[in-house]
Amino acid sequence: MHLKVQKKYQFMYRFISWNVNGLRAVAGKGFADIFTELDADFFCLQETKLQAGQIDLEFLGYKSYWNYAEKKGYSGTAIYTKHEPLSVTYGIGVDEHDHEGRVVTLEMEDFYLVCVYVPNS
């Protein structure tokens, strides 16, 4: 698969949001190639369904921030970024929900980036 990507302005950011519905399955099916070709500034991933240490997906020039669900094989979010955030917040500050790994927020200089995975119902 070849994707043609063209940046029009240097000061613009490229954001990608992708519900991967299980990152382990996607990782073996060209995920790294797509990731590299899209060359986004920020990749937000939802429904990663991973626990800490289950997979090692690092990309040159990117730092990653993961929010894992306590329950195995359930929800989870991650953000890969080329830019250093001012701060990172995991969850929404509600203990009842924060164990599900549904939210990662990056505070950037000019904006907040919130990666969210919400239930269907």
Regions picked out by a protein language model, each given a short descriptive name:
Residues 2-59, 69, 74:
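N-terminal, active-site-proximal structural segment of metallo-dependent hydrolase catalytic domains
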